Amino acid sequence: MISIRRARLSDASGIAAVHVATWRSAYANVLPEDYLASLSISRLASFYEHGIRLGLGLHVAASYGERAAPPILGFSSAVRCREGRLGEGEVETLYVLDDFRDRGLGEQLLLASAKHLTQLGCRSAFAWVLSENPSRYFYQHLGGKQIASGTTWVGGEDIPQIAFAWDPIETLLDVNA
């Protein structure tokens, strides 16, 4: 059984493991190889543990009783934006292990993040996605409209990225209804 729920402190290592595995898979030919090799589960676990303690909007796809399945299969995070130029809320992360993709977990995690943002009072949402990430079509499929482009500094390089938005946020909630 798989459930989508708020992250707990005990999930931090599992979230970090998903982060490392998905980045090394999805960004193998996008981000610098040495940067991907340097990703540390223990360092990221501390980062996510801190976020969970602060009550940030971290959600997980957790497996219970699934044979040979890791305890955390995917995760998402969402926060209220300080400046709100692109939207009032940002889906900062959304990652699902390769072996568990195409099962609706990404949609469920994105919906959990959108619901969290509405609870914070956000009326719109956006997500930055690396331009060469094949999953960018997932956001379009769920009604995201490309609204901006730019770069982000990762591993000593400027990496192109694009922003998808749902304004109003109900356009995302309705797609998942």
Question: Can you name each region flagged by the protein language model?
Answer:
Residues 105, 122, 144:
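Short phosphate-binding/catalytic loops that engage adenosine nucleotides
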Residues 70, 87, 121, 158-160:
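Residue-level preference for beta-strand/loop junctions
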Residues 6-12, 17-101, 107-112, 116, ...:
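Acetyl-CoA-dependent GNAT
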Residues 18, 120, 141-142:
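Structural motif
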Residues 117-128:
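Conserved GNAT acetyl-CoA-binding A-motif
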Residues 126-136, 140-145, 149-177:
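C-terminal "cap" of GNAT-fold acetyltransferases
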Residues 1-3:
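Extreme N-terminal starter segment of soluble prokaryotic enzymes
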